[in-house]
């Protein structure tokens, strides 16, 4: 038998049962918070509502009931995003999985399959988490469509819900800084606009540190029941209780984006890569020499041209990195060090966001799916994972983002 034929563990039904058992990690905060739903096509449509605190009116007995629609006052429509990748397993792996030798050899191959499948599933779920985070933190989402075209979705978040503090108010060293007032103003705006009380606040550890050492917060803390050292033993809970900002989540997750160099680096600061879609200005790009162990250089990304497939860095790398051989990697936090984010996860009795799974493939499947393809010479098998969908935001006025200081100052 050739390839994966006759190997029960590589049958699609068995393979997908295995991968479906991998639990979405708790670190994927938004994926666990908001539900997923199957949509009827790959063109996702949704209604948007601004303000959702209405109630049924009184009427006189015997009178006609007033009508109310289920639709919001705005609508969105976009093609679903599609993502996939694959992993190769060689001939030795296939032979071991057929159990020609010892049982221990077979178990080793099974563990290799399970580890590879789990990594693919984890990366696929990570992409969903990134999409929801981009939608909430930035109010937009960009991705590739057919023909290599870049598609961007705007979710209709009011501009008043994105606030960048000026130098005098910045939370790090602004002369008139007042994080307490800014946070309460944000909370009040969500209440006034969306008619709901925000119950989640999100920041990373760097922003939490800025708040911990803020003089006004420490002064308030000294007058409260928390002046017993709790601020540093459980800082998130104390800050949340002190400011009345609901569940404060410290979200330190990072994501990684990779691309292969298409041309060899020179003295130019313009770098050509095979896919610049997910690279962002302000991040750091790491150049890896793939012929050497753990050899790299870091440069700051100044700008990105996704259509041209170029990244402009602050300074060209001192070493030469070869196109087609070496790669670049950007690592970036889901939420930047200078952002404080607040939102309500529900309005009008329903979740404010949802992930719409779109159908794809000849069998019209939804959500995560794994399949295989045999290689003839040398013998091996590719394990591929796929997913398709789009996050939607039903209540755009339930979020609020404060950019508290310039990252260059930190």
Protein language model annotation of sequence segments:
Residues 1-58, 281-288, 304-305:
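A generic N-terminal leader/anchor concept
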Residues 31-99, 152:
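Assembly/oligomerization interface modules of large self-assembling protein complexes
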Residues 2-13, 331, 349-410:
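Hydrophobic, glycine-enriched assembly/anchoring segments
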Residues 255-324:
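Autoprocessing Asn-cyclization modules and mimics
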Residues 162-174, 178, 185:
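Glycine- and small hydrophobic-enriched segments that form the cores of compact globular domains
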Residues 80-158, 178-209, 379-387:
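Long, contiguous amphipathic alpha-helices that act as assembly "spine/axial" helices in icosahedral shell
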Residues 58-64, 71, 264-268, 282, ...:
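Glycine-centered loop/turn motifs
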Residues 194-258, 330-354:
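Extended oligomerization regions of viral-like shell subunits
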């Amino acid at each position: 038998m050739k390839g994966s034929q006759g190997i029960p563990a590589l049958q699609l039904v068995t393979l997908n049962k295995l991968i479906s058992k991998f639990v979405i990690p708790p670190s994927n905060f938004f994926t666990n918070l908001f539900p997923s739903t199957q949509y009827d096509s790959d063109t996702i449509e949704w209604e948007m509502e601004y303000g959702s605190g209405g109630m049924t009116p009184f009427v006189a007995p015997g009178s006609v009931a007033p009508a109310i629609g289920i639709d919001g006052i705005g609508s969105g429509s976009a093609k679903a995003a599609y993502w996939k990748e694959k992993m190769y397993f060689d001939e030795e792996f296939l032979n071991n999985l057929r159990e020609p030798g010892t049982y221990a050899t077979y178990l080793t191959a099974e563990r290799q399959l399970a580890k590879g499948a789990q990594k693919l599933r984890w990366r696929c779920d990570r992409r969903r988490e990134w999409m929801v985070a981009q939608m909430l933190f930035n109010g937009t989402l960009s991705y590739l469509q057919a023909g290599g075209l870049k598609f961007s979705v705007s979710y209709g978040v009011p501009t008043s819900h994105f606030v960048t503090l000026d130098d005098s108010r910045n939370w790090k060293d602004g002369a008139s800084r007042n994080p307490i007032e800014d946070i309460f103003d944000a909370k009040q705006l969500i209440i006034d606009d969306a008619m709901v009380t925000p119950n989640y606040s999100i920041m990373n550890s760097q922003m939490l540190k800025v708040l911990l050492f803020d003089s006004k917060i420490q002064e308030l803390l000294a007058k409260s029941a928390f002046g017993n050292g709790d601020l540093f033993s459980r800082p998130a809970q104390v800050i949340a209780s002190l400011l009345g900002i609901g569940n404060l989540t410290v979200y330190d997750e990072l994501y990684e984006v990779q691309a292969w160099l298409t041309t060899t680096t020179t003295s130019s600061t313009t770098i050509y890569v095979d896919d610049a879609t997910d690279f962002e200005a302000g991040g750091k790009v790491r150049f890896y020499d793939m012929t050497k162990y753990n050899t790299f250089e870091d440069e700051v990304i100044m700008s990105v041209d996704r259509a041209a497939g170029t990244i402009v860095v602050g300074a060209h790398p001192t070493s030469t990195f070869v196109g087609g051989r070496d790669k670049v990697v950007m690592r970036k936090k889901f939420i930047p060090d200078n952002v404080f984010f607040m939102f309500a996860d529900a309005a009008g009795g329903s979740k404010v966001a949802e992930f719409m799974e779109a159908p794809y493939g000849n069998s019209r499947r939804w959500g995560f799916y794994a399949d295989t393809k045999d290689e003839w010479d040398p013998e091996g098998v590719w394990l591929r994972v796929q997913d398709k969908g789009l996050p939607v935001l039903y209540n755009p006025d339930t979020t609020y983002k404060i950019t508290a200081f310039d990252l260059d100052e930190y």
